[in-house]
Amino acid sequence: MLRALGRLDGSTALTLSMHSHQVMVAEWKRRVQGAPTEGLLRKVAQDGLRIVSSGGSDWLPGSGRAEKVEGGYRVYDRKVFASGAPDGDVMNTSAIYIDPEKGPTVLHFPLPMNDPAVAVLANWDTLGMRGTGSQDVEIDGAFVADAAIAASRTPGKWHPLFHLISMLAFPLVYSVYAGIADGAREVALGLARRRPQDVIGTLAVGDLENTHAVMDLGHKAMVEVGAQAMPSADTTHRIMTLRNIVGSSAMAVGSKALDVAGGAGFYRAKGLEQRFRDLQGARFHPLRDREQQLYAGRMALGEEVDL
């Protein structure tokens, strides 16, 4: 569904993927681990609860500050790339608490978006994905009760939660980019078929088709791993390798689609310009290319994978 939606509207598809992967994680925990997440799932299904995430920008290091107070914590931070923030109901986020015994500790918790200490800033003015509403979210002393802390971990270290997120979230997120690339290919071929092609033009179409095939095969493999594997360092390795393949191939499809379309593709009304811009978002999700290559190299050498 996300790939099909991405063909038509990348921003809507990406925002939906950011909500959907959190629902999918909760459902996986309920089904596989017997975790008590049914209440959350019912709120999503029955009440239309919309979930925002700051996980991509926080990632393993975490960010923000949590100060211990009676009964919980006061949290301070500015979260970026919070897709769907203007219409979200709750944000799954984190902050770093300096534990006097354990040292820096990342705390994970849900935070209501209507909390008076939470503000969605009007600063989403970007190259692409302009319709995602991924504004910064300012958190200025929001109270988080002890009971609301869902998990804690050491900053910068791979935690089982992140292997699970990698396995489930990234096939969804990169379905969006595969869909945008599908749409770019279709537009380019439609424009190319309107005029006679010389050998150079036909070769450009063949090059586009080969690149799209690499992306398509990578995406199908990514979805298969996410559906059949169990979270682990090796599963994350496979998912992130495929994330690199799908993301780079999707961006290449966008570029080659412009070559195939010719000058007509330069006009915004043709639909390639926005797709090209939206595809650039594929480079910014973790693990970014060099981080993925480092992870892959460490896995191959049998070294510690922590970044």
Language-model-derived ranges and their functions:
Residues 78-115:
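DPxDG-like acidic metal-binding loop motif
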Residues 179, 206-213, 240, 244-251, ...:
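Generic structural signal for well-ordered, non-transmembrane alpha-helical segments
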Residues 126-213:
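Glycine-rich beta->alpha junctions and the first turn(s) of the following alpha-helix
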Residues 193, 214-245, 255-266:
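C-terminal helix-coil-helix/basic helical segment that borders enzyme active sites and/or dimer interfaces
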Residues 264-307:
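Glycine-rich phosphate/cofactor-binding loops in nucleotide/flavin-utilizing enzymes
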Residues 1, 75-77, 139, 181, ...:
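Buried hydrophobic positions in well-ordered alpha/beta secondary-structure cores of metabolic enzymes
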Residues 1-87:
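Glycine-rich flavin
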